[in-house]
Amino acid sequence: MPERRTSAVLAALALLGLSIAGAAYAKTPDEVRAACRAEGRPCVGLVLSGGGARGFAHVGVIRVLEELGVKIDVIAGTSMGSMVGGAYAAGFTLSELENTVLGVDWDRMLGPRPDRQLVNWRRKLDDYKSLPSSGLEMSHEGTPMLPAAFVPSEELELFLARKTSAFDMVRDLSRLPVPFAAPATNLVTGYRVVMQKDCTLREAMRASMSIPGAFSPAQYKGELLVDGGLVDNLPVELAREMGADVVIAVNVGTPLSEKEKLTNVVGVMAQMVNLLTEQNVRKSLGELSSRDILITPDLAEYSSADLKKSAEIIARGEEAGRKAAERLRVLARPKVEWAAWNKARTELFDPPEKRKNRVYEVLVAESKNSRIPPERTIERAAIRPGSVRTRGELDAAARSVFADGYFESVTYRLDPGPDGTSVVVLEPREKDSVWSSVRFGGSLETDFDKVSSFNFLFAHSWHLLNSWGAEWRNEIQIGERQRFLSEFYQPLGTTLPLFIQPSISFERQSYDIYGTEGKQAIARWRATQFDSQVLFGWEMARLGYAGISAGWISMRAKPEIGRDPPPQERYEAPYIGAHLFLDTLDNVSFPTKGYRLTAEGRTSDENIDGRGGTHVFKVNVLVPWSREKWTALLEAEIGRSTVSGAFQLGGASRMVGSPYGRWSGSRLEYARFALARNISEFMPLEAPVWAGVQTEFGRAWNSVMGDDLTSGGRDWHKSVSAYVGVDSLIGPVMLTVGRTMGEGTGIYFLWGYRE
């Protein structure tokens, strides 16, 4: 079989093989029973319950069944049981099944946002404003709409599609090598829906695994379906309906919590779901006869959320299976007979992950009332006709489209093309709330003594204002740094990488002035700035942008407190600028890979101090290197300006242990080196926890007005510090302690990103 065979060819061969294999591939319940009667044995049904991570125990039980030589005639599985049971029914070998479970990247699967390296550069910039990736989304009528789930379903759907694509053409799951069915729950009526006829294996798994609140409901034939555990977590009756005479039931459901543990809203909500599940499980247990075998692994130490303990849970399942071995041997078949059955079960299944697909054409499935042109979706996917792509590469393309934030999920299918090629059909499911969104962000910083600062940011965006994807953003920030921004981002075409962005902004902030004789501030100024500009730029895919701008700026600085403050300064002038922003970091606050390069310059013929024109230029580069759990980080920055005090050093973010804004000047040189380790395994938190040390070197001085407004002149200053940080759902939280030589020691608490 050529390497480029398509899913359609595989499915056709599977169906042909199923029709030839006779008893091993019986379909209807009557055919199942007749085949078993012909062999003089009872029909064996395997029932696998739901239970989240506890469902990994099913793999261990299956290992024991294979060792004993038990032939399985039908499989019914719920939730996690549908994934394990469906994969086994489709032809996964035991090793493939185990490797699949052990190889899942659960951080990615359950991540609240796409990989940052795939996100559009505008969304990357939001990270530096401490804005969350999602917020309160609004319908076209202005009605607030909460998300359908806490976790995007994108990774789950891609995972299921990748693992089951060899049988995409099979729409009757009784025609799999082992007949299979999975219960789901109709979210509107509350009734059980049996996923077997007129559905793919992927659709059945997706519906049965749609945990309410965690994943969005599955859409099937116009209905909303959620986790089958709500109505039939241990589908014994379903297995009998499929033809089973004897049922091997594996129950891994979470038991009800004791009174002492119901002390918070999370525990109470979980108990409510478990109550519904427990009621239908008790009913199913009552349907077991003396011939049936119930296996209940000892999982008291594990919860449904222990997804990273799969190897341990599989072992518990195997242990429980061995305890039931004596009863299971009654159902065992001769080794030769079982081996022939297992070969027939697995021989037509070809894992699709590494199969290469030559792309003939890229299409977008039709969608009603879509506001996003198909050309834009295809351009974002970056799949070129004639290219050869693996499933992993096609998954990455779907993730790139999803990362724009306008879709509930983006999947795809491979239709047969001419001469063994594949037609990639993208299947984006657009959000109902892509019209506008509101997000709230902020930052907090304190030294537990004299200095505390807090900023609160409100941001509203109108999305997709025209077919080219325009966006109007407005931001208001209050706190230590008061700011207003309004900008209109307009791409210059559906697929062109060019854009234009007019904007206006106002900013006001106070800062201290230090003299040359000591560490105490001698004055406090308030600086205000108004800026209006038009930016013309070139987008570099997900990497960033380069652009030029023209605008008008008004700056004013006046004294608030202090003795003998410098004269008031005011400056107004038109200017032109250049901008470069390249960012592939995986995380802003705790990066482990990628890089960031920013450069910005502005020049004007007008001057402040009567010394020619006004020029400001700054470049910053940050590069992390990682090995296992360790990460080294290097950052460097250089600034040059004709404006005195344009750059500052000092505080928790620059030169830990020195006062905020301790040094300022028209020249800046700064570097830091950090070494950090992920210590999550030692902490009782789900969020990543980091501990690190760093050393900083920097200096800032004036070359315009002399050194009268900055202490230390051109001297280099050194700081050493240590920190512990948590990358939490509400943003980075960090505790830092450090010392700047010759200045002092400081302890700081920080929440949110701070430059």
Regions found by a protein language model. Name each.
Residues M1-A11:
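Bacterial N-terminal signal peptides that target proteins for export
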Residues A11-I20:
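Bacterial N-terminal signal peptides
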Residues A24-T78, G86-R399, A403-V410, D415-P416, ...:
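Patatin-like phospholipase
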Residues T93, L102, T185-V188, D198-T200, ...:
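Solvent-exposed coil/turn segments that connect beta secondary-structure elements
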Residues S257-K259, R329-E347, W552-I553, G594-L597, ...:
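Acidic/histidine-enriched alpha-helical segments
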Residues G392-A397, Y406-G577, L585, L649-V656, ...:
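Gram-negative/organellar outer-membrane beta-barrel architecture
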Residues V423-V425, W435-D447, R563-P566, A573-F697, ...:
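C-terminal outer-membrane beta-barrel translocator/porin domains of Gram-negative envelope proteins
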